[in-house]
């Protein structure tokens, strides 16, 4: 029996090591061309390897788990959507690869979206290498299922838009480490917050407020039989924090800042419209939210991830679709929002008028 397995496992192991080394070297070469030479300290964690050891931590862990140096295959994932989607895809890949004893590689496009903001560690699988691999596509729902613990196949590429704590919350410390902000991103956000004043005093409690507008204003009612957050929801959420904490300051970010200025009452002097709302450059807004103590979110993965990284108390918009919404076929609220978060039901009356 043992001799029959050798032709299969050894070429696979060699191929996986080749893929890892090739991807890492290619990635390093691209960085050297684009950037000034960096010290070892500044290099991404995935490219810091000694000349005598080409094994990644993931490779060593996989070998230890399965014995005899046998590598069982590799996982990757589609890179689609904006920042919140990309973070959900990354975290899901990270968790499922660990769960199934596989190596995890991310597409270059995902690295380009996340690496400028976070200290991510998964190695990059460049397109030239990916084209040579016989991938098996594997669709993921937006919540964890038991079958995902035993995913068949050696070369699996996940599809879908997974962004649920049910995939990765058991690895929360590691996920938080993966999404640690680069120093300059964090320091810029903290400097802004340190400069804020509420009625002349420096606040001790910061509440990040993310208001998703943009395409959702039309997509939610016209496609998903749902609503976005209205003025009433935001007033209730702000008042809940005012009642709970002494003199909090609300740091508002949105891709609809004009609407926010018209609909969020700032007359008390405790609301700051801080975000730039530039969807193509989300780092500033996201960093501000994560450096706050608590979160008010509306809908969308951007707000979910900001709340997840910030910790503290979170208030979210709940029940924002009709019961027969097709959205509920692809989205489970209980898998999106942590149990300890507090939901305020949305006002669905605008939908009932039509």
UniProtKB/Swiss-Prot annotation:
Primary location group: Golgi
Record key words, sorted: Glycoprotein, Glycosyltransferase, Golgi apparatus, Lipid metabolism, Membrane, Signal-anchor, Transferase, Transmembrane, Transmembrane helix
Uppermost EC category: transferase
Positions of glycan attachment: 199
UniProt xrefs under InterPro entries: Glyco_trans_11 (IPR002516)
Pathway in which this enzyme or protein is active: Protein modification; protein glycosylation
Record-level Gene Ontology MF annotations: alpha-(1,2)-fucosyltransferase activity; fucosyltransferase activity; galactoside 2-alpha-L-fucosyltransferase activity
E.C. code: 2.4.1.69, 2.4.1.344
Keyword Membrane among UniProt keywords: yes
Catalytic activity as recorded in UniProt: a beta-D-galactosyl-(1->3)-N-acetyl-beta-D-glucosaminyl derivative + GDP-beta-L-fucose = an alpha-L-Fuc-(1->2)-beta-D-Gal-(1->3)-beta-D-GlcNAc derivative + GDP + H(+); a beta-D-galactosyl-(1->4)-N-acetyl-beta-D-glucosaminyl derivative + GDP-beta-L-fucose = an alpha-L-Fuc-(1->2)-beta-D-Gal-(1->4)-beta-D-GlcNAc derivative + GDP + H(+); a ganglioside GM1 (d18:1(4E)) + GDP-beta-L-fucose = a ganglioside Fuc-GM1 (d18:1(4E)) + GDP + H(+); a globoside GalGb4Cer (d18:1(4E)) + GDP-beta-L-fucose = a globoside Globo-H (d18:1(4E)) + GDP + H(+)
Cytoplasmic face of the membrane: 1-5
Membrane topology, record value: Single-pass type II membrane protein
Its job: Catalyzes the transfer of L-fucose, from a guanosine diphosphate-beta-L-fucose, to the terminal galactose on both O- and N-linked glycans chains of cell surface glycoproteins and glycolipids and the resulting epitope regulates several processes such as cell-cell interaction including host-microbe interaction, cell surface expression and cell proliferation. Preferentially fucosylates gangliosides GA1 and GM1 in the antrum, cecum and colon and in the female reproductive organs.
Remarks, miscellaneous: In rat, there are three genes (Fut1/Fta, Fut2/Ftb and Ftc) which encode galactoside 2-L-fucosyltransferase. They are expressed in a tissue-specific manner and Ftc may have no enzymatic activity.
Matches recorded under PANTHER family: GALACTOSIDE 2-L-FUCOSYLTRANSFERASE, GALACTOSIDE ALPHA-(1,2)-FUCOSYLTRANSFERASE 2
The family this protein is said to belong to: Belongs to the glycosyltransferase 11 family.
Protein name stated in the entry: Galactoside alpha-(1,2)-fucosyltransferase 2
Organism from which the protein derives: Rattus norvegicus
